[in-house]
Amino acid sequence: MHARNGWVQGYNAQAVTTGEQVIVAAELTQHTNDLQQLRPMLAATAATLMAAGIPQRPGTLLADCGYWSIANLTEIPDAPQLLIPPAKHGRQGKPRKDGNPSASRSDGLRAAMTAKLASADGKALYALRRQTIEPVFGQIKDVRGARRFLRRGLAACEAEWKLLCGTHNLLKLWRHTRSRPAPTPLAA
């Protein structure tokens, strides 16, 4: 991956979770940003749900500002409701001779998404990101100590990432079933 000071042997881990922090799609890429990852992650999520026999598509997708692009908002067919905050940095248009910034193609989309996120429903939905995807990465990195990949090469590291995500789901399932009271045996 390209970094500030040259090139590093690094990867960009992607994951999609449910509201209960169950990982439904996981991928590893060598792209330095998330701009091109929304479409593949939506496809991986749809494939996982279809393989599990769940015909229902996701209703809302919450993503961070790294996924913000005109293409991600307009060119994905059958996309769920997207809540992606506009990028905080980047070109806002070159100043015109009269001093006002020129209008860019994304100004209307940016204003619409900002309004959607500023609404009460938008704020409530987007706040769920803090309790769905962020804890998953925190649990994998900090609690389980998986801050670096142990193997080399994209294929090997992708297998390791998917193994980490699978064991995360198994731990969720184990903790969920362990917290339930044991069924009482029937009298004979």
Please provide the spans of the model-predicted regions.
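Anion-binding and metal-coordination hotspots
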Residues: M1-A188
